[in-house]
Amino acid sequence: MPSIFEKYHLKQVINTSGRMTALGVSTPRPEVVEAAMAGMNQYFEMKDLVNKTGEYIAKLLDVEGATVVSCASAGIAQSVAAVLVKDSDWLLENLHVTPIENNEIVLPKGHNVNFGAPVGTMVALGGGKLVEAGYANECSADQLAAAITPRTAA
């Protein structure tokens, strides 16, 4: 049986950078692989699993709520959407249909990076408009405060 590199003509690399989206992010521990395999061979309502894992993680972290996401990009987009949608069922299903007045997301300039996808793109996918504050190597509380306007959502 050919390796994945041979089968798909992939270039094998040595990861000296740590966890990076461009390199597949991580190598799971054996117990994680085992848990995933067990889950893949069972049937259950995904909504129930999402809700219960969120409750479990929130309790572990002692926070109000938590949600498991598939990747950092999804987490950013979903977090922005949650801030904008709040409790509006209509907006939840029509996020990009109508302009949202208060959709600005303030972010220190140095945090607007491309980790496999630009943070600004994820903010836009979540319905937000990115507003950078400060500089790539510095962002003070005053610079953050100056970027906040009546249109700021977060």
PLM features: what roles do these ranges have?
Residues 121-131:
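Short helix-loop-beta junction
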Residues 110-113, 136:
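Short glycine-enriched loops at secondary-structure junctions
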Residues 137-154:
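Active-site phosphate-binding strand-loop segment of PLP-dependent enzymes
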Residues 29-74, 82, 90:
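Conserved N-terminal alpha-helix of the aminotransferase class I/II PLP-enzyme fold
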